[in-house]
Amino acid sequence: MALSGILNKRVTAYRADENELEDDFSSSEELNTLSSEDDEDEDENDESENEETPDNTSSEDDGDNDIKSSLSQISFGALAKAQQSLGPLKKGAKRKHGSEEEEEEEENNTNTKYKKSKSDALNELRERIRRAKEEKASKSERSRDSELLDKKHKEARSSKHAPAVQSSKYAVSRRRVVVDGENVAQAKSRDPRFDSAVQSYSHGVKSSSYSTSHSDLAAAKNYAFLNEYRDAELKELEEKLRRSKEDDEKARLKKMITSMKDRKRAMENRERERQVLAKHRKKERELIKEGKKEKAWFLKKADLKKEALKEKYESMGAKERQKGIERRRKKVASKEKKEMPRSRRIVEG
């Protein structure tokens, strides 16, 4: 009965999963282990039976008879199923060789799949890189087109007098201009003899409200000999003008002579104003000392010019004064005529 139970187990194991190869291997291993265990049990039983008395031999004969009777009772369908289940196991070497071939095929398939997957991944990566490059190129083209459109838009102003518009989306330069060579103050040479900062305190001359007078006074005191040189140069130029015959040379000499005379006249006027101012200050100090005044009265610039002009005409002779007054009248008349409207200027002319 034990053999029929084993056969039934084999049949059920095969029925459980006929399609899977791994279950067949497991069932074959179980059958081998069971058969080996049965053989070991039978060997042990034989050894024990050989060692035992003849009574045991009779019991063995009874057991064989029982097995034969049990085998005779098994149906042909069960035997066919058992044969089907045991058929592949009898060809163990071939089955094993077939399994190795299947494993090799599976490995080859996996290798080919891995290779295909690797090649597919590489192709996909290349495709992505190609797409990225195409997108980048398209973006650069779009940016160029947009820049051109912006430039055209910037150039197209409402009028030529309209201010130019510049976008603030420009990258800041990484370089910073620490010292600009154009805006750096260049070293200028100066002569301290003619510098007002030095002359204002030279020779005991203190600063006053008339900043132009004290510097001129210091320069006049220190370089009074230059007036003699200027007079000599003026006479020399007049002599050259008298001897010259070319028109261009005469025009150039006349221009130089007039500029020198104007400069000399301006210096004389400044000196006259300085003398008038000095006389006025001296007079005011004397009045304060005498107690006739409590506070000094300071001349305005307009009053100072009037006093200087009055002193100038008083120092002149009769004919020279008349010429000076006539010259002054013409100068004032021309100035007023320039300020007059054009319609009135024509009527009076």
Curated annotation (Swiss-Prot):
Coiled-coil features, chain-numbered ranges: 101-147, 227-319
Span list, region Disordered: 1-174, 259-278, 313-349
Entry GO terms, CC: 90S preribosome; nucleolus
Basic and acidic residues composition bias: residue spans: 117-158, 265-276, 313-325, 333-349
Source superkingdom: Eukaryota
Main subcellular localisation: nucleus
Database matches in InterPro entries: RRP36
Cellular compartment(s): Nucleus, Nucleolus
Keywords of the record: Coiled coil, Nucleus, Ribonucleoprotein, Ribosome biogenesis, rRNA processing
Acidic residues bias locations: 36-64
Cystine pairs: none
Biological processes, Gene Ontology terms: maturation of SSU-rRNA from tricistronic rRNA transcript (SSU-rRNA, 5.8S rRNA, LSU-rRNA)
Family affiliation: Belongs to the RRP36 family.
Cited function: Component of the 90S pre-ribosome involved in the maturation of rRNAs. Required for early cleavages of the pre-RNAs in the 40S ribosomal subunit maturation pathway.
PANTHER family: RIBOSOMAL RNA PROCESSING PROTEIN 36 HOMOLOG
Subunit structure: Associates with 90S and pre-40S pre-ribosomal particles.
Name under which the protein is recorded: rRNA biogenesis protein RRP36
Gene: RRP36
